[in-house]
Structures are given as structure tokens and as C-alpha cells.
From Swiss-Prot:
GO MF annotations in UniProt: methenyltetrahydrofolate cyclohydrolase activity; methylenetetrahydrofolate dehydrogenase (NADP+) activity
This protein's name: Bifunctional protein FolD
Subunit structure: Homodimer.
Keyword hit for Ion transport: no
Length: 282
């Protein structure tokens, strides 16, 4: 029986609708709108597309959005000074610095400079540490979105063997903490992992976030597994994931499509986090 599709498009619409409803409720009480500052350094085309999508979502949901499109020549100190000003701005609840930054700017230093209560990307060491200690507040958007997608399957995650392919700070590592928090037994694989196939084949829940098209053949998938494909790759003018979708969907019980799976959830959770940050500041 072919896998059931987990639609991030549908779920993200529901989450955004709920966020917009709450914002309207606050506005009707005479309160200010949540505020989000979006910083883009340079003119990377992919980053411009992502930032545009985030700004449109803010507009749709009633979030006050302030844009800072800085030239590629911007120095690290200039960026840190702007972040410091936004940290102090009572109208701004969330600060988003679009990554990647130009090579001359230290991304870690920039992330650490954002106030943890305004870190709606969930990348600040303080927020990652809280997740590690099982007391999360603002959580990384893509892993949190994936947890929401997993909830829709109705599968009890306790005791499930979750395997993550990819150990990035943005997805793989916080994803491991999220799944651990949910009661899974977690294996994280990376470029030094030996015999990747055997690890993948043991996965009840497989999360792949590498950014290499079809790196995971469908035949590796365990019968009945839940497959979450985070990869977005362009091949011959089409968007494809990191998992060989057609073959994997014959073996999996649930699978996310590319596009329309994890992608829409990331922006939805960004809006969700902005609302959370706003509520904590109110």
C-alpha cells in the first residue's frame, strides 16, 4: 500500500490561521501588533526569495514587519550594532538574520548577539540549551515544524527508533533533541558514519536533511517507516528531495513530498515563534 502523504502545505495554513486569529484577538483588546525585524545582508537570490516569503507571511497574519536590506559590504560591527538597537526596541519581538551571511561576518557571533527572547529562529545557544534540558521556549523552526507534521500521523513516538541523516546546527542537531524529548531512541548520522544503509534501514522514523538529491535510495527504507525529507534540490528544472521519493513511498507508511512537505512548515513556525516571543514580552 502506498505511503500516506504528510502535507506541510495544509498544516502550515492551519497554523498561520490560528496565529492570525490570536493576533486579531490582541488587536481588538487595544494591544500592539507583534513586531518582526528581518535583516538581509547582500543580494543572494535564494535568500531574497526566502526573505520575501517571510515578509508576505507577516503581512497576511497582521505582524508588523521591519526590513533591513544591507549591502554586502556591511561590516560585522555594523550588523552587531543594528542587532543591539533591535534588542532594545520595544516594538520588535523577533529578530531574524537571514543566513548564510557573507564570509567576512562570523555567523555564530551574530546569532549569539540576538537577545534569546527575540531569537525566533531558535538558534541561540541559550535556546538550544533549554531544549537540551527539556525546558524549551523558542525552538528551531524546521525541527519544530517536523514535530508538528509527525503529530498529524497519530503515531505514538515513544520508543520509536528515529534516525537523522545530517548533523547541521540548523536541522540535524536540534532535530535529535526534539525527537529525544518526544521519547524516541535517536541515531544521528553524518559524513563520517560508516554503513549508512544499515542505519537508515533500522529507522521507524527517518529524517533526511543533507541537501543532496536522492542520496537515500528508496530500497533502504524500512517497511512502514515514516519518512521526513527536508532536502530541497533543483534537478533538471524540478525540485526534488534527498530521498528517492517514488521508491520510498512504496515502502513507507507516511512520507513528506518535495515541494509541499517540510518547506511551508518552516515559515509557519517562524510566525508561530514570533507570536510566542510577543506573548512573552507582553
Amino acid at each position: 500500500m502506498p505511503a500516506q502523504i504528510i502535507s506541510g502545505t495544509e498544516l502550515s495554513k492551519n497554523i498561520k490561521f490560528n496565529v492570525a486569529e490570536k493576533i486579531q484577538h490582541y488587536l481588538q483588546q487595544g494591544k500592539r501588533a507583534p513586531g518582526l525585524a528581518v535583516i538581509l545582508v547582500g543580494a543572494d537570490p535564494a535568500s531574497q526569495v526566502y526573505v520575501g516569503s517571510k515578509r508576505r507571511s507577516c503581512e497576511e497574519l497582521g505582524i508588523y514587519s521591519k526590513s533591513y536590506d544591507l549591502p554586502a559590504e556591511t561590516t560585522e560591527q555594523e550588523l552587531l550594532t543594528l542587532i543591539e538597537q533591535l534588542n532594545q526596541d520595544p516594538q520588535i519581538d523577533g529578530i531574524l538574520v537571514q543566513l548564510p551571511l557573507p564570509k567576512k561576518i562570523n555567523s555564530t557571533k551574530v546569532i549569539e548577539h540576538i537577545s534569546p527572547t527575540k531569537d525566533i529562529d531558535g538558534f541561540h545557544p541559550y535556546n538550544v540549551g533549554r531544549l537540551c534540558q527539556r525546558i524549551p521556549t523558542l525552538r528551531a523552526c524546521t525541527p519544530l515544524g517536523i514535530m508538528k507534521l509527525l503529530e498529524t500521523t497519530g503515531v505514538d513516538l515513544y520508543g520509536q527508533h528515529a534516525v537523522i541523516v545530517g548533523a547541521s546546527n540548523i536541522v540535524g542537531r536540534p532535530m535529535a533533541l526534539e525527537l529525544l524529548l518526544a521519547g524516541c531512541t535517536v541515531t544521528v548520522t553524518h559524513r563520517f558514519t560508516k554503513d549508512l544503509k544499515s542505519h537508515v534501514h533500522q529507522a521507524d522514523i527517518l529524517v533526511v536533511a543533507v541537501g543532496k538529491p536522492h542520496i537515500i535510495p528508496g530500497e533502504w527504507i524500512k517497511e512502514g517507516a515514516i519518512v521526513i525529507d527536508v532536502g530541497i534540490n533543483r534537478v533538471d528544472g524540478k525540485l526534488v528531495g534527498d530521498v528517492q521519493y517514488d521508491e520510498a513511498s512504496k515502502k513507507a507508511s507516511f512520507i513528506t513530498p518535495v515541494p509541499g512537505g517540510v518547506g511551508p512548515m518552516t515559515v509557519a513556525m517562524l510566525m508561530f515563534n514570533t507570536l510566542l516571543a510577543y506573548e512573552s514580552h507582553s
